[in-house]
Amino acid sequence: PVFYGGNSKGENLFSNSLLAIDALSGKRIWHYQFVHHDLWDRDLPAPPNLITINVSGEIIEAVAQVTKSGHIFVFDRADGVPIFPIEEKHFPASKLIGEEAWPTQPLPTKIPPISRQEFTREMISDSFAGTKSMISWGPSGKANEQSIIEKFDELTSAGQFVPPDEKGVIVFPGFDGGAEWGGAAFDPNNGVMYVNANEMPWVLKAKKLDFDSSNPVINYGAGIYQQHCASCHGINRAGRSNFPDLKNINRNYGHQSLQKVITKGRGVMMGFPNLNKTELKSLSAYLLSDYSINIPQKELKETSRKALPYAVNIAGRFLNEDGYPAVAPPWGTLNAIDLNKGEILWKVPLGEYEELTAKGYPKTGTENYGGPLISAGNLIFIGATNDGYFRAFNKKTGEELWKYKLPAGGYATPITYKKNGEQYIVIACGGGKMGTPSGNKYVAFSLN
């Protein structure tokens, strides 16, 4: 994600958009952009659902899209006309030099969001208010000396679509939703959508870059790093979550091999073929701490004029010192939405921290990655939670009926199939998210 858009002014079509394309001709039929000039990593996390609904007696072939901000948009499939009202609402301007945040963003006005939309001071968890705060990608980071309340007061928290600033902006719901990659399930028999959601606050912070240095090559390379690499590998190259530490990368790479990885990518890392030779050489010099690299001053100045004035990066989740979210629960939910009427039917916590439940806390829900599956027997099956359970819910009431401890987190959407007259459900147990152990198994269940 790019959190500074001073060099890409405008709405930035067709990013963050749903496109209807004629599959035979490739012609665009209609489109809808959900976020203009995205500064918050609000890409669409999941595929849309093709649905048939009954709105005031009219049968409509529609398409529904869930979003990271926790909203559900529904359109007529043929022409892209919204089924329920959408309003372009005004949001604050950016305080960063050169940034021109788009003045409005579209929000549904009928279907309620599936995640809370603003983290206020009153929503700080009573149980953790006096504990130390932690801004970290995972639950095992280093706590600050400030309490959660003190840290909250230091940050900007004003709801959706507040542009990044140098103080730090709370993005809530966070960069992983709202809805996430598992997407939603839709029941054609009753017009109800079932979707899980996250309610985790994250912090987004801008840092002004200074390109005046006794070693302009290294300094310029540091600027390139902050713009393109720090959101994953950390501002100080120390790594985070599943992204490696780069501070000693010179033990394993030279300039040629490192530049090849930067350009072409490796594993989950995308490549950066857009970097020119000067940018690539400077970045390589910075990462390898090679102060001997020389670039002609004229060439460096010409390139540096294109450099962005800020590095805007994800600082991490806003947690307490024990790794629990700073906001009061629920931290993850499962939701049923009647898309015939645009109404939420029920909402229940999804997942739990067993150590908190044992102390008498109500189920808090957890962050979740992976979607639901509906059966014909009025059941919803879902893994997704960081407690590692696979669960079944009553689709009419949201009551949790059953759970099974998986060998690793089921951060995937289950599938179902039939063999020899018997129905099975399978979920991939890859784990690895949210600081949980990785796994390599598929687990299958028989529906008897």
Residue ranges and their predicted role:
Residues 1-2, 8-15, 31-51, 90-108, ...:
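Extracytoplasmic beta-rich repeat domains
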Residues 11-26, 72, 76-80, 332-338, ...:
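Beta-propeller blade signature
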Residues 29-30, 83, 345-346, 399-402:
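A structural motif specific to WD40 beta-propellers
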Residues 37-123, 176-181, 185, 274-282, ...:
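Repeat-solenoid scaffold signature
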Residues 62-65, 192-194, 345, 380-382, ...:
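Conserved beta-propeller blade signature
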Residues 189-196, 200-207, 415-448:
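Blade-level signature of beta-propeller repeat domains, shared across WD40, Kelch, NHL, RCC1
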Residues 206-224:
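Electrostatic cytochrome c docking/interface patches
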Residues 216-219, 226-231, 236-297, 304, ...:
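Extracytoplasmic electron-transfer domains, predominantly the class I c-type cytochrome c fold
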